[in-house]
């Protein structure tokens, strides 16, 4: 997703910024094969500009998206309140939680699945979960996230990074609501679509809160929505995702 956003920005006037992103995951991609990104100029307007981007691998579209860009302008304002959650300094990091789980299960770090090994960013979940013992949980999750400060101030890069981050764990709230996760036997779990809206100019140097909830899981699909807040409570972005949650019989 981040790469398609950057590709679209290469065709956009510098006065415009991405405010709306809608995408579909069409086919599985192969990390060992190259991907070609094609950008279609759908509309160039004074206030709004639209681009369609397609990711093609071995002659087939594996992903496509539509992105709307807007010139910044003043207008009426309102936003929802940030959830009342503990400050990040009072919480354990994902790494600390992982090490506790490893010690409890007497596992080596090398035995941990790739998806739950240490990330390059720091994440401190408000609600803890044991990946190896999934159980039904309330359909929401809150996580404080912080980068190492190395992300450029360039808004294109900051938006692309936040779009990338937004895909981490978004479907997890829907999985939690039915007591499964990516380690569950016979579970087929995959993103089907992803949408994101950028509300403000970004500054991702410090902590920000990713608050996710899942209104419904049904018909082998889970639906989740996320709100991303700066530490001082400003809503900087929103996102939604529907994903496949298909549990095959033995």
Feature locations, PLM:
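Terminal targeting signals and extreme-terminal segments of soluble enzymes
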Residues: 1-250
């Amino acid at each position: 997703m981040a790469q398609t956003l950057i590709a679209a920005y290469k065709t956009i006037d510098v006065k415009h910024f991405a405010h709306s992103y809608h995408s579909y995951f069409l086919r599985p991609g192969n990390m060992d094969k190259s991907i070609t990104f094609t950008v279609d100029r759908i509309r160039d307007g004074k206030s709004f500009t639209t681009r369609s981007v397609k990711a093609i691998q071995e002659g087939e579209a594996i992903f496509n998206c539509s992105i709307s860009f807007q010139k910044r302008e003043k207008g009426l304002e309102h936003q929802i309140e940030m959830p009342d959650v503990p400050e990040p300094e009072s919480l354990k990091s994902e790494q600390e939680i992982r090490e506790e789980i490893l010690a409890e299960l007497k596992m080596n770090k090398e035995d941990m699945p790739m998806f739950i090994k240490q990330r390059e960013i720091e994440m401190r979940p408000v609600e803890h979960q044991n990946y190896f013992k999934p159980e039904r949980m309330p359909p929401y999750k809150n996580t404080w996230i912080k980068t190492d400060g190395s992300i450029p101030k360039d808004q294109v890069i900051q938006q692309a990074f936040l779009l990338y981050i937004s895909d981490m764990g978004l479907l997890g709230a829907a999985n939690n609501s039915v007591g499964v996760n990516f380690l569950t036997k016979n579970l087929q779990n995959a993103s089907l679509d992803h949408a994101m809206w950028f509300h403000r100019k970004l500054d991702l140097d410090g902590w920000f809160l990713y608050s996710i909830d899942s209104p419904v899981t049904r018909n082998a699909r889970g639906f989740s929505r996320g709100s991303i807040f700066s530490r001082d409570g400003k809503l900087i972005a929103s996102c939604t995702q529907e994903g496949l949650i298909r549990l095959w019989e033995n």
